[in-house]
């Protein structure tokens, strides 16, 4: 489960915080901001820095293709470190030690980009073994909360690429179901983030290798239409935006105009299911979830009520302090 906002981190717990399943593992990066208590401590996901290619480093750093001199300086530094088990610190040190004056300016600019990676906290001594993440009859949640978009995109790209490769080469023998929350951010209609290519490949041919894709989004209009049309079944909840309705209609041959008109009027928990999972479109009522919810919106009314109570308590404390001060002053005057 690709989880950008820590929505799925409590899958192992019931709504009253009891154990629900031992077959669920949460993975975090050191930069993940999700703060929660789980029966088991989350596993750390990290990437060995020397595993990154030049293109991957440039993408995560935000170095554009047109900055050819900066990219050349970065490539020169990587060439110096070639065949070594180098770290991010080694690359920074190599860029700093550039002695050639003609290359020093570009190396310094490259250094400014590369030093940003130190704050990302996803690079370690080893890359997390995918076979720790992929297990039979098991759910692994990748908590990407708090990561910059490019970093979250890179982690998603790397995980999905490794999953696809393992299944393509039959190095993991069981089918894999990949859930991508906020899918419009990873496979958008217009932009081309790093993970878009591998998601499109999985959508097109993944089922041949036992990799199945489940996209979750509130904005279907923002998802690449080729990928959306590859979804054989759709579970559609309330949609009021006309552009999103058009995207759903265009991606499903079984979505009639009558059904489309029903979408804005669906109540909470109601959905229309179309596609290969059902012979005809059906409307269903989805039961309440059994597991604890993560990443939910705050209860604004409750929070404001608590804020009001807190403010009143502080006012009372100030009044008591003033009374004490007046009492002390009166006592002093009496002397």
Where are these regions (language model features)?
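P-loop NTPase motor domains
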Residues: 1, 5-203, 208, 267-275
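Short secondary-structure boundary/capping segments
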Residues: 14-19, 194, 230-232, 252, ...
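Glycine-rich loops and low-complexity Gly/Arg-rich segments
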Residues: 24-27, 54, 71-73, 165-169, ...
């Amino acid at each position: 489960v690709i989880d950008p906002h820590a929505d799925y981190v409590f899958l192992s717990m019931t709504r009253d915080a009891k154990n629900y399943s031992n077959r669920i593992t949460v993975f975090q990066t050191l930069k993940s901001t999700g703060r929660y208590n789980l029966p088991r401590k989350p596993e750390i996901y990290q990437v060995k820095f020397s595993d990154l290619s030049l293109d991957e480093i440039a993408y995560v750093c935000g170095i554009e293709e047109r900055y050819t001199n900066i990219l050349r300086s970065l490539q020169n530094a990587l060439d110096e470190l070639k065949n070594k088990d180098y770290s991010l610190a080694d690359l920074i040190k190599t860029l700093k030690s550039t002695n050639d004056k003609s290359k020093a300016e570009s190396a310094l600019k490259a250094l400014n980009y590369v030093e940003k990676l130190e704050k990302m906290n996803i690079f370690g001594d080893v890359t997390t073994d995918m076979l720790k993440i992929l297990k039979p009859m098991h759910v692994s949640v990748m908590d990407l909360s708090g990561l910059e978009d490019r970093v979250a995109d890179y982690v998603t790209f790397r995980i999905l690429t490794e999953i696809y490769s393992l299944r393509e080469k039959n190095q993991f023998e069981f089918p894999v179901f990949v859930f991508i929350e906020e899918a419009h951010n990873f496979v958008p209609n217009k932009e081309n983030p790093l993970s878009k290519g591998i998601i499109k490949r999985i959508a097109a041919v993944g089922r041949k290798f036992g990799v199945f894709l489940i996209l979750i989004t509130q904005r279907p209009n923002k998802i690449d239409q080729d990928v959306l049309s590859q979804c054989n079944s759709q579970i559609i909840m309330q949609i009021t935006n006309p552009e999103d309705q058009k995207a759903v209609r265009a991606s499903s041959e079984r979505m009639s105009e009558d059904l489309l008109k029903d979408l804005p009027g669906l109540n909470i928990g109601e959905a229309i299911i179309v596609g290969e999972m059902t012979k005809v479109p059906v409307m269903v009522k989805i039961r309440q979830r059994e597991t604890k919810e993560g990443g939910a919106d705050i209860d604004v009314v409750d929070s404001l009520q608590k804020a009001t109570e807190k403010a009143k308590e502080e006012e009372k404390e100030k009044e008591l302090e003033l009374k004490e001060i007046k009492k002390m002053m009166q006592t002093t005057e009496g002397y």
